[in-house]
Design a protein with these regions (language model features):
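Alpha/beta-hydrolase superfamily serine-hydrolase fold, recognizing
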Residues: 1-176
């Protein structure tokens, strides 16, 4: 990433965001930590949309929301098993950023979740850890929604509200 952004020059700011889903939020969170530790990548903001932050998959929402909605426990397990090849890697912060011992000094963040998403609780826990570590983080849960709702603007009105919220936060963050 640093090599790809080098032509932009040192004054350019980057947002670490996840326009896809939980896996994109996972990668964005990990990249923000790596960039902080490297000290040379100017990430201005983290937009974490229903992020997967704990590969152990033990949060209560995995049980309560793991069946009957778009993203199921079976689907999560399928993707997990294609991403993580050793069970011990679930405990590595590079797979589970929630487990990093030091989340201080990270860019401001918006963590957006859905009420009926198996990933809801780990997103909330990550937002809480960011705040506890002294970062500016906002947590918003669209309580009546499922994983992936933000891409369903033609059928779900709250998707428009979520996109508007995300766009507004990015505009403010990148204007600084």
């Amino acid at each position: 990433m640093r090599k790809g952004l080098a032509p932009c020059g040192p004054s350019q700011r980057v947002s670490s965001n996840a326009p896809t889903s939980g896996a994109g939020g996972n990668l964005a969170a990990v990249v923000a930590i790596l960039a902080r530790d490297a000290g040379d990548l100017p990430i201005a903001y983290q937009l974490l949309i229903y992020p997967a932050t704990d590969m152990r998959r033990g949060h209560p929402s995995h049980q309560t929301n793991g069946n009957g909605y778009l993203l199921t426990t079976e689907t999560i397990d399928y993707f997990h098993d294609h991403y993580i090849d050793e069970p011990a890697h679930d405990h590595d912060w590079r797979a589970s950023p929630l487990l990093h011992p030091d989340l201080s000094g990270l860019p401001p963040a918006l963590v957006l979740t859905a009420g009926f998403d198996p990933l809801r609780d780990e997103g909330l826990d990550y937002a809480n850890r960011l705040v506890a570590a002294g970062n500016r983080a906002t947590y918003v849960c669209f309580e009546r929604q499922i994983h992936g709702f933000i891409t369903m603007g033609r059928v779900i009105d709250e998707a428009h509200a979520a996109v508007t919220l995300c766009a507004g936060e990015l505009v403010r963050a990148l204007a600084r």
